[in-house]
């Protein structure tokens, strides 16, 4: 059996010298699961050596004590001193190391500054790359939300990815992430090893619900709650202890690891001792609070008898590993059934190697009939279906069983994640479109759960007559999910109920799989026409997770920042409708190209073919980050699959529609064909100005003064665009303002303002006509107008800012 599924009881702490890795939704130490149970430490007032840590004796006592409290991981906000490294090694503590840099101001505008930050990261990482106690690095922590909006989310994301790449180059065997927070929820570098989020929610129900959302943002990677705590100055020590107890219980069920903020009340930041917050498990005098001794609440989890059903047809290449993983499940009451659907290869000899497995054979009748036979033979009240090319996580059934704690949930499932590839082709296919994916109505309830990881109440399955026999290869899971929901049942997604699912190892097998999916869609259309659109594609109520990663597209208009960028939970909102490029691929365009060639319209044929390639490139751009690194040559092959996959799948679906007489029944309104968008109009940068001040002046004061002094109407931006104020004009030239205030040390602030000219289509056409009629005169008129608007805006802003004492204008 592969090492990545050979897991036993989660280790309290890794053995000395054993590095922590990631595998799917969890951390591992060797072949054992490892759950970081961490606490933050520092930053402190510099010691005698200038290090942001306590003196040697105090440091040793602190780390020894927190180890005695049961913590196995320490989060640091600065690189550790040599003394701290020695103590961590002695106590077998894992360290998550923060790498601080000048992130409080505009760090992107100057190339020299960017290179300096990258070099700083590489230097610090290189110093620690071989230390066995360093588990992971954070390349940043909670970048200020209005600063990210000012710099541009995509640009900041790209820079964080550069930092991770640079760090990984210096320490290829360490883990890297960025400590995010809800106010920039969308800001997730695509190359992180795990998702880290600082969350402060005081109500247990709110925290539990938000955890579910964070798992979808994490995708197929582990979720680490990198900060969570409660201020005793506000809520009291009793509430802190109670909160820590339920926090640990929730994380044990739904997160790969957690960090409590913080060990002590001591907190030194920006050269100042912070004394008005008291989050520590110990106070400044090291007096222990009740929360330090709090233990996780005991949660009574359901433990029904579960029948695991594996249906196979000639699956000799993967069945042995599948059964090996199933016999090692950490669950007290289950059985394993293998349903041999008339295989021509020797399934019996493989099953014979597992005495606890019941092998049941039928004449070849297809997947649905095999699933039904398994249900009839099963003794369990829960039927857990998986495929013969899957390998179950050791806690798979534990998570599935917990999902049936309420009668309304009739089916549960979790993620299916590609394991390390067996060859180069499987590495490409793992990143290709068309893999089995769950469809979510909200963060907890699913519309569809893939059949490779699907548990159903036996009573609910029998009530709808089981699986339909005509789904012989694929589509059975979609049909069963829709029918369960039509009967009022609800489907639950459980992020921890993970299976490894091998993707196809040859391109031919992948394309045959997609052809099978297309044929199954025709069958589904016959049975459920209301779920299919005019061109034959399935129409879901929920969002599909798989082919398009929900946090990858940071295009303006998809993020809701809130008025003036102050939204507390700033997330990405996707409509689920089609963009115009989605119409340019598939069978229809191949037919149009063929017709154009036959008619001799070669230019049109070339144009149509080029547009279909453009659609493939766009599809490739929107795919999730490849689970395994791809070379440029492999990316070219992936683009080719993005082009050919819709053709193969749609062609098979169309063929099935014709033979079955299937017709779609969903009638969309015209607005549903295209994605609704909050994209900004064309904008031209008029200029940028900066004002330095003390703590008495910021962007809100500037915007308020400008609003009061501006002679015309002023509109507040709606929160979808990276704007604060909009100054409309009757002639089609609208000016907009974007602001940010940078908070530097010793109370120094820098408020920046950017003026943008918004151009309507009419003004663009008018400018084009003027330039065409007379290039020189038109250019002079346009440049004069821009200069006038820039100067006028600058004068108004300067007057508003300099009207306050202590404000000075900075020269660029």
List PLM regions with ranges:
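Conserved donor NDP-sugar-binding/catalytic core segment of glycosyltransferases
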Residues: 395-426, 490, 502
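Short, flexible, basic/aromatic active-site loop/helix in glycosyltransferases
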Residues: 414-415, 429-447, 462
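Short aromatic/hydrophobic "clamp" motif used to bind/position activated sugar donors
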Residues: 383
